[in-house]
C-alpha cells in the first residue's frame, strides 16, 4: 500500500516540477512512477563498487570522466525507461544505472552517500543471503576509486537550478 502511495507522490511532484533525486529504491520508485518495470535481476546481487559508462546525456548535465564508479547493493533493477527519459550511466550488469526521468526527476541505482567501510560491513552482514563469490568480488571492488563527490556536485546543481 505505502509503495503505491509513494509512487503517486513522486508523480505529483513531477507534475508540478518539484526537483527530486532518487537513490537505489528511490530510483526504482521513479521507474514505477513513469510506468516502467522493476524486477529482481537474473544476474543476482550487485554489491561493492559498480563501474558504469557515462552517456552523452550525462556529459550534457556536467558529468566528467570516462566512468561512474559507485557503491551498490541491490537485487532489483529498472528494466526499461520511457523514450523521453535520458540514460545517464549504464553497465552490462545494470543497463539503467542512472536516469533523468524528466526535467525534475533524476535517480541512480547506486549509493553516493555510502562509504566503502559501510559497504564492507553490509556485505559481511548479508553473507547468509549473498553468494560467497559475489561478496568476495564485491569486497575486492572496494579498492576502486569512487566518483561520489563529482556525482553529488552535478546532482546539487540540478536540484538547485530546478528549485
What are these regions (language model features)?
Residues 14-15, 54-163:
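Amide-donor transfer/coupling interface in amidating biosynthetic enzymes
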Amino acid at each position: 500500500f505505502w509503495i503505491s502511495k509513494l509512487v503517486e507522490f513522486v508523480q505529483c511532484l513531477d507534475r508540478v516540477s518539484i526537483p527530486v533525486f532518487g537513490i537505489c529504491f528511490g530510483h526504482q520508485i521513479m521507474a514505477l512512477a513513469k510506468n516502467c518495470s522493476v524486477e529482481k535481476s537474473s544476474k543476482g546481487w550487485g554489491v561493492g563498487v559498480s563501474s558504469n559508462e557515462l552517456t552523452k546525456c550525462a556529459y550534457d548535465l556536467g558529468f566528467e570522466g570516462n566512468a561512474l564508479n559507485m557503491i551498490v547493493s541491490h537485487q532489483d533493477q529498472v528494466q526499461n525507461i520511457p523514450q523521453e527519459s535520458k540514460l545517464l550511466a549504464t553497465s552490462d550488469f545494470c543497463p539503467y544505472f542512472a536516469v533523468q526521468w524528466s526535467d525534475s526527476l533524476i535517480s541512480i541505482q547506486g549509493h553516493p552517500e555510502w562509504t566503502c567501510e559501510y559497504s564492507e560491513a553490509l556485505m559481511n552482514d548479508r553473507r547468509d543471503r549473498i553468494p560467497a563469490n559475489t561478496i568476495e568480488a564485491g569486497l575486492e571492488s572496494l579498492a576502486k576509486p569512487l566518483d561520489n563527490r563529482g556525482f553529488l556536485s552535478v546532482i546539487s546543481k540540478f536540484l538547485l537550478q530546478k528549485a
